[in-house]
């Protein structure tokens, strides 16, 4: 930890409370963010981490906008929410599928993404769907809902960038940055969804955030 802190990160994202205690004992001034892998999805969880002097909580991706708004309006701690990127077929940070199938822990950043593979669906020993992407969620995209996300009280938008190509990160971040700036400048903004689709995606959904339940997986 000591050598890493020489970089002077603006904040560290963690899940392990034991690591949190170690970091705070040695580096009391560093800002700590609780990861989405902690599966924080209610006011009680947020208030608990606030009492532990966590600076920001990244909420679980399975929450909807009304639940998030209630938390933001009843808790003083900064709230961060995933607004764009891959979704997990399980609860974020709680999936054991990769560990069991590929012997790679998704909860340690080594997910083999077996949910992205094709599977067949059987009913009464009869194949009703053959080699379809039944467990592969579409990518979360909430660019059209930026005003509602801001009005909910969210302090930080989280955009997936790990292991993504520079053109993907650049295009997506640029689009959300523009949408946010237009909101605060009180200008009308129509996002160019077609432009965003030019970078890698699995099709777009508004996910659990806006209860887009019928448009979550690719081949359902």
Task: Please report, for each region that a protein language model flagged, where it lies by residue.
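Short, small-residue-biased leader/transition segments that mark boundaries at the very start
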Residues: 1-7
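N-terminal cofactor/phosphate-binding cores enriched in small/glycine residues
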Residues: 3, 14-18, 22-23, 30
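Short active-site oxyanion
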Residues: 8-12, 55-57
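Short beta-strand segments at enzyme active-site cores
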Residues: 13-14, 158
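Surface-exposed amphipathic alpha-helical tracts and adjacent flexible/coil segments at the periphery
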Residues: 26, 30-33, 47-220
């Amino acid at each position: 930890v000591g050598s890493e802190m020489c970089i002077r990160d603006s904040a560290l994202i963690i899940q392990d409370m034991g690591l949190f205690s170690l970091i705070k004992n040695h580096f009391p001034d560093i800002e700590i963010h609780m990861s989405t892998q902690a599966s924080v999805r209610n006011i009680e969880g947020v208030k608990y981490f606030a009492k532990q002097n966590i600076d920001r909580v990244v909420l679980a991706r399975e929450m909807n906008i009304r639940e998030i708004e209630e938390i933001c309006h009843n808790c003083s701690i900064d709230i961060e929410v995933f607004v764009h990127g891959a979704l997990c077929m399980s609860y974020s940070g709680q999936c054991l599928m990769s560990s069991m199938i590929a012997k790679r822990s998704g909860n340690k950043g080594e997910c083999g993404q077996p949910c992205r593979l094709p599977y067949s669906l059987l009913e009464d020993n009869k194949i009703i769907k053959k080699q379809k992407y039944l467990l592969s969620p579409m990518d979360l995209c909430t660019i059209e809902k930026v005003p509602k996300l801001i009005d909910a009280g969210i302090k930080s938008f989280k955009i997936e960038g790990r292991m993504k190509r520079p053109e993907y990160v650049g295009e997506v971040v640029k689009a959300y940055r523009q949408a946010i700036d237009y909101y605060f400048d009180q200008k009308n903004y129509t996002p160019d969804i077609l432009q965003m689709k030019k970078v890698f995606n699995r099709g777009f959904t508004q996910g659990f955030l806006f209860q887009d339940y019928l448009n979550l997986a690719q081949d359902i």
